Structures are given as C-alpha cells and as structure tokens.
Amino acid sequence: MNSVKELNVKEMKQLHGGVNYGNGVSCSKTKCSVNWGQAFQERYTAGINSFVSGVASGAGSIGRRP
C-alpha cells in the first residue's frame, strides 16, 4: 500500500504537472501524447451510445415505410 501525504497550498503551488483530457490525450508543457487504447475505446463507446440513442428515439425508422 502506498503512503499518501496531504499537501498544503504552498506545496501544491510548487507542483508542475500536465493535463489529462480523459479521452486518451495528455499534454505536458513541452508535448502531447495519445494513449491509443483509451482514445479508441472512448470513441468506440461514444459511437455505440449514439447509435443506440438514435434507434431508441425512433431515428432508426427514418426512410422506412410503415
């Protein structure tokens, strides 16, 4: 188990870190990188959710005759 130290405001101001956008892309001060596994999974999941939402709302019947 890792030990965790709670930082005060002064200590937090001294930290220099990057940004993780939550979709597989993360950037530091000098470069950005992509975790392709996470990026693909995020995009795949969004596509499936969009498809299912469209079918559930009746968009799947557009262009079909009753």
UniProtKB/Swiss-Prot annotation:
Keywords from the UniProt entry: Antibiotic, Antimicrobial, Bacteriocin, Disulfide bond, Plasmid, Secreted
Q: What are the residue ranges of the propeptide?
A: 1-18
Localization: Secreted
Locate the transmembrane regions by residue number: none
Q: Name one GO cellular component term.
A: extracellular region
What Gene3D superfamilies does the record tag this protein with? Answer: 1.20.5.130
Q: Got any disulfides in this one, which pairs? A: C27-C32
This protein's source sits in the domain of life called Bacteria
Known InterPro entries for this protein?
Bacteriocin_IIa, Bacteriocin_IIa_CS, Bacteriocin_IIa_dom_sf
Indicate the segments annotated as coiled coil, or none if absent.
none
Major localization listed first in the record, in broad terms: secreted
**What biological-process terms (Gene Ontology) are attached?**
defense response to bacterium; symbiont-mediated cytolysis of host cell
- Extract the Pfam families matched here: Bacteriocin_II (PF01721)
Q: Which family does it belong to?
A: Belongs to the bacteriocin class IIA/YGNGV family.
Task performed by this protein? Has antibacterial activity against Listeria and Enterococcus.
Could you tell me what this protein is called?
Answer: Bacteriocin carnobacteriocin B2
**Which species is this UniProt entry from?**
Carnobacterium maltaromaticum
